[in-house]
């Protein structure tokens, strides 16, 4: 195994690179996980994403070499930033129905010059089916694994509602209760990523089906685990309400929600309703230290203001057969969106719980700023190490150093 960084620039949480799978790209995950991420996020979310890839590998016939790489580094970390393992992703796409190896290469490399995805040769295929035979095996395994996915997702959504605690309720909990809750929420987040991974497999099977109707629908690799259109759709809906009113657009761009409400109470109410639904969502929503729309509703308002001048054109109605296949694709996306949204909902529950714990650490003079709790790992937040301040300082300095650098979008061993 080799380090990606040179000249002593390797981060504490960096992965090592197997020279048989040497190419990694941040292109397909940078929007949702725009690092450098905090240690807490790296600990909780990256382990959750790896739980998802391990579940996905159950439906593949990858062989031992690819299975190990897929489970450990399908999504890797370098300089506190997530990178997709392009070499492994391409091999997976060759097996999974509805996945496109060409799109994986195109979106991941985005014009970057890479000499070879497999400079040591493609991994041996011993014990691994190829081509259509592999895809047939995958479909059979997927249907068996997906049999309970809908019921499990519904139960997961119900748990998110049942286990929600307000800020006031969190304040009333003991330290021990908060510690138990942190463990529970970490497990819930991992459960959500596993469900999202299953629905990504389902999306691929659906994509392979609708391609028969001439619709170009593909899964463009494991980075699609982090793809969500919910914020864009909500923003576009709100932008449509303001599209023809320059005054409202100007107020939105100025983040003046009171001004928008005074000028149009109905639009103000629409924004309030959107924030109540989407308060757990926001820019870089998988990063635990980030603010969400519920913390700062003006972020959603400003996004809608920016979108109001660039509304999409109406789509020409399709024929009945195309509509049927479009509904199939839409239903597959909706299931994955629901699993993803609920994972983000549990992420926000953990975010709020960690904020409360950080405030208590600050009151006890165990840390200097409440937000420093995000520079601990999950286990360290539950059982605070004696050298917590030193760890936090070292990790904060390291993250700030990475923030000042411009890491490459594509990493490969030379």
Spans of model-derived segments:
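Contiguous hydrophobic, helix-prone segments at protein termini
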Residues: 2-414
């Amino acid at each position: 195994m080799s380090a990606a960084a040179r000249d002593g620039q390797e981060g504490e949480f960096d992965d090592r690179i197997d020279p048989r799978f040497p190419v990694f790209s941040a292109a397909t995950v940078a929007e949702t996980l725009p690092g450098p991420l905090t240690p807490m996020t790296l600990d909780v979310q990256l382990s959750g994403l790896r739980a998802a890839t391990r579940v996905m590998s159950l439906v593949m016939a990858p062989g031992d070499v690819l299975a190990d790489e897929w489970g450990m580094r399908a999504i890797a970390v370098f300089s506190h930033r997530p990178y997709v393992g392009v070499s492994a992703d391409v091999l997976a796409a060759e097996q999974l129905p509805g996945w496109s190896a060409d799109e994986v290469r195109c979106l991941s490399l985005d014009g970057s010059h890479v000499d070879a995805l497999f400079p040591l040769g493609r991994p041996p295929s011993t014990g691994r089916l190829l081509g259509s035979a592999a895809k047939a095996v995958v479909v059979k395994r997927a249907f068996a694994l997906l049999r309970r996915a809908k019921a499990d997702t519904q139960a997961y959504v119900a748990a998110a509602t049942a286990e929600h605690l307000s800020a006031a309720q969190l304040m009333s909990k003991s330290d021990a209760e908060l510690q138990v809750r942190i463990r529970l929420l970490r497990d819930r987040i991992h459960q959500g990523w596993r469900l999202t991974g299953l629905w990504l497999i389902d999306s691929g099977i659906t994509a392979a089906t609708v391609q028969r109707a001439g619709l170009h629908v593909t899964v463009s690799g494991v980075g699609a685990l982090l793809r969500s259109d919910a914020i864009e759709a909500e923003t576009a809906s709100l932008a449509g309400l303001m599209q023809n009113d320059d005054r409202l657009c100007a107020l939105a761009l100025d983040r003046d929600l009171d001004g928008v409400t005074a000028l149009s109470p109905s639009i103000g109410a629409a924004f309030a309703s959107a924030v109540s639904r989407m308060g757990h969502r926001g820019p870089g929503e998988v990063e635990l230290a980030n603010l969400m729309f519920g913390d700062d509703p003006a972020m959603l308002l400003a996004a809608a203001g920016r979108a109001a001048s660039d509304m999409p054109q109406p789509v020409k109605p399709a024929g009945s057969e195309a509509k049927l296949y479009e509904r199939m694709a839409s239903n597959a996306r909706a299931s994955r969106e629901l699993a993803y949204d609920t994972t983000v909902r549990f992420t926000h529950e953990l975010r709020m719980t960690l904020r409360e714990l950080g405030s208590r650490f600050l009151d006890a003079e165990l840390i200097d700023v409440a937000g420093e709790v995000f520079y601990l790992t999950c286990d360290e937040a539950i059982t605070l190490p004696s050298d917590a301040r030193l760890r936090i300082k070292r990790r904060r300095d390291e993250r700030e150093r990475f923030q000042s650098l411009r890491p490459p979008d594509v990493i490969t061993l030379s």
